[in-house]
From Swiss-Prot:
Top-level taxon of the source organism: Eukaryota
GO CC terms of this entry: extracellular region
Tissues expressed in: Expressed by the venom gland.
Record protein name field: Hyaluronidase
Entry similarity comment: Belongs to the glycosyl hydrolase 56 family.
Length: 31
């Protein structure tokens, strides 16, 4: 899974709950 912050212009990969990502950025469920 990945979370992207458009304002900061970078993305990171998560292994944490998706709701946490939604609070801070845009969540993408990668297949």
């Amino acid at each position: 899974d990945r979370c992207i912050w458009p304002k900061e212009g970078f993305s990171i990969y998560w292994n944490i709950p998706t709701h946490f990502c939604h609070n801070f950025g845009v969540y993408f469920k990668e297949l």
